[in-house]
């Protein structure tokens, strides 16, 4: 199979899975294994296509991101979504990521640990659906600092491969009385700085595996993940309010079974 086709397939996988509660890491490892695309070059490629997904969110939410530069609501203590909400949502994961980055990359990016993350994340999502209470926040402007911090703490779970950033944060939002749409949008926004920092750090360590010959493949993967991520996010927001998290949780368990059969055994 040609590199361009592999790039296209993995770009679709990344675009679909990055912001859905199904674990992009688990999917990329499984599909990469089935395609025979593994090793340091594959890891570097994954970093590049993650940047495509990040760009999709930056464009979709550019107005909201620009509004965060306005410090008036913060100074005047208005009940309006502001940069401090994002800080509270990002800070715990940044600390966890910096402290555990090398350990995670060295010991936790293993097939069996990803299976554990897939199942554990599914259990959390089902628990959040069962225990969720009537929402008190129906938009980002309704979000309290306490709810933002709660979601940020749940994002720490996503440093474990296979757990899923979206699954962790949306579950945390439901348990903190935030509705599906608001929890999802906040999840996307706080993912941006964390992902930019993590992918930037990884890219600094992996740039030596890049070569001029890789540019066409990496470009196809980047563009594909960008387009698919934009479509996936818009569709997911509409779908989540109708079906909730449980179908995604059941899919994760199914994926864990596939992972065990095709990668571990």
Where are these regions (language model features)?
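Multi-pass membrane proteins that catalyze or facilitate reactions on polyprenyl-/lipid-phosphate substrates
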Residues: 1-265
């Amino acid at each position: 199979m040609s590199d361009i086709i592999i790039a296209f397939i993995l770009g679709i996988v990344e675009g679909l899975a990055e912001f859905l509660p199904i674990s992009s890491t688990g999917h990329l490892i499984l599909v990469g294994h089935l395609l025979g695309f593994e090793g340091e070059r594959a890891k570097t490629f994954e970093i590049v296509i993650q940047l495509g997904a990040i760009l999709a969110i930056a464009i979709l939410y550019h107005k909201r991101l620009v509004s965060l530069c306005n410090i008036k609501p913060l100074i005047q203590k208005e009940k309006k979504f502001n940069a401090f909400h994002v800080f509270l949502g990002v800070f715990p994961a940044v600390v966890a990521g910096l402290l555990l980055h090398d350990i995670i990359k060295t010991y936790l990016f293993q097939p069996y640990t990803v299976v554990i993350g897939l199942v554990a994340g599914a259990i959390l999502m089902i628990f959040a659906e069962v225990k969720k209470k009537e929402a008190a926040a129906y938009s980002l402007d309704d979000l309290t600092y306490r709810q933002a911090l709660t979601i940020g703490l749940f994002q720490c779970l996503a440093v474990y491969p296979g757990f899923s950033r979206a699954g962790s944060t949306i579950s945390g939002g439901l348990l903190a009385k935030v509705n599906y749409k608001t929890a999802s949008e906040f999840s996307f926004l706080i993912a941006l700085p964390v992902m930019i920092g993590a992918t930037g750090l990884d890219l600094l360590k992996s740039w030596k595996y890049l070569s001029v010959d890789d540019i066409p493949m990496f470009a196809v993967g980047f563009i594909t993940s960008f387009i698919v991520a934009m479509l996936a996010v818009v569709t997911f927001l509409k779908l989540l309010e109708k079906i909730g998290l449980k179908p995604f949780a059941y899919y994760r368990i199914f994926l864990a079974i596939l992972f065990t059969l095709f990668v571990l055994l």
